[in-house]
């Protein structure tokens, strides 16, 4: 088993922090705009239950778009591939994650579940009789994956996003017009913004990454937390679409299945080897953590983590 050196990891974090001045926090969401752009932390979770970390890994980060991969896993378990991919595609895009442009082409279904339009469709498919019931089902799934029953969501961030989610509302109405979703838009927005506001530490993120790295199995008990096929689909989307419209560049430079969020979080899964959680709020122009990507690039090269 490869041993990760903590002193080396601390040095990598300090090196990557130097790039923070070139990034910017997601201030278009008021609650996220309060983040310290110079913050950077990482946790690596290995199959033998070892955690190596650097930076302040007690800081909680909201999942934002990282939640898309978890919601997709839950919906695939509930409804199966055929039903899910009847409503959302599988292809990557070079358009920004919030773009409506490709929806205007035939068919009108979103290109993939990692862009906002596709994620809204996936969230609309979470089973339950009310927003609170559906959110609780998702939270229960997240808690099992992370091995942490205390995980919840940030009401402040959820409220901030709900009040400013005008573009996502427009995506919902477009999707409703084309009969891809059929529920009340405000209820869907409430569920989606609370989903994005689920918060956890880098260690929790790394534990979820490890579950994916182990093909959906619990690292302690080997119990399947999701079917192997679902874990495989999730990791495939993480490679092709997980880093927005710079996923190709990330695959070449880092080569690890990963999903980012505009909070500055990154969830990564190195098949069979480890899960990684990163938090660095300074974003690049694509919405990915600038310092986090630099850190993962250094880590991948040092420990030969690329899957390619």
UniProtKB/Swiss-Prot annotation:
HAMAP family: Glutaminase. One of its GO terms (molecular function) is glutaminase activity. Keywords: Hydrolase. Belongs to the glutaminase family. Gene3D superfamilies: DD-peptidase/beta-lactamase superfamily. Its EC number is 3.5.1.2. The gene is glsA. InterPro entries: Beta-lactam/transpept-like, Glutaminase. It catalyses: L-glutamine + H2O = L-glutamate + NH4(+). The lineage of its organism: Bacteria, Bacillati, Bacillota, Bacilli, Bacillales. It comes from Geobacillus kaustophilus (strain HTA426). The keyword Zinc-finger does not apply. This is Glutaminase. One of its GO terms (biological process) is glutamine catabolic process. Substrate binds at residues 65, 116, 161, 168, 192, 244, 262. Homotetramer. It comes from the Bacteria. The keyword Hydrolase applies.
